[in-house]
Design a protein with these regions (language model features):
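Sensory modules in modular signal-transduction proteins
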Residues: 5-29, 33, 37-39, 82, ...
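Sensory-domain boundary/capping and coupling elements
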Residues: 5, 9, 128-146
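Non-catalytic regulatory/interaction regions at protein termini and inter-domain linkers
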Residues: 1, 69, 139, 143-152
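Sensory-domain boundary capping and coupling elements
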Residues: 102-104, 121
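PAS-family sensory domains
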Residues: 113-123
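PAS/LOV-family and closely related PAS-like sensory domains
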Residues: 7, 37, 46, 55-101, ...
């Protein structure tokens, strides 16, 4: 027997059950949708996040650059991050900084009007920390090799 389900149910289930954070913000950068993955990643419930500015998760020192890019995308309707993953720092409710990667989907009304952007995100903090440690180890080994090769 073939299971019956609607396209709408399938899409809703994927967004609700994925471990990835899925956030939709309107043209002004106000959060309008926040899934369970976003709750787990950032520590805010949907009730706390919806209606707030994206500043909620953007570290203060990165906000000017963030808003410059966001406004450009909303004005032009074009983003290069629909095909590429963007890696940026973010901040959790408890103030902890994390590293995230995300892609953007621009959402339009049937009329073609740009409504805002959905971001699909994953926390890559552990991977970034491992890469940093590997780079530090490599630098230390290279320094030792340099010393070994020098005459006494």
């Amino acid at each position: 027997m073939t299971p019956t389900y609607t396209h709408e149910w399938l899409c809703q289930s994927v967004v609700e059950q994925t471990q990835f954070a899925v956030i939709f913000s309107d043209r002004d950068g106000v959060i309008r949708f926040w899934n369970a993955g976003a709750e787990a990643m950032f520590g805010y419930t949907a009730g706390e996040a919806v209606g707030q500015s994206l500043d909620l998760i953007v570290p203060e020192r990165h906000r000017a650059r963030h808003w410059e890019g966001y406004r450009r995308v909303m004005a032009t309707g074009v983003t290069k991050y629909g095909r590429e993953m963007l890696a940026v720092p973010a901040v959790r409710k408890d103030g902890t900084r994390i590293s995230i990667e995300f892609t953007i989907v621009l959402l339009r009304a049937p009329s073609g009007e740009l409504l805002g952007a959905a971001a699909i995100m994953q926390d890559v903090t552990a991977r970034w920390q491992q890469q940093k440690q590997l780079k530090e180890r490599l630098a230390a080994l290279e320094a030792k090799l340099e010393q070994v090769g020098k005459p006494a």
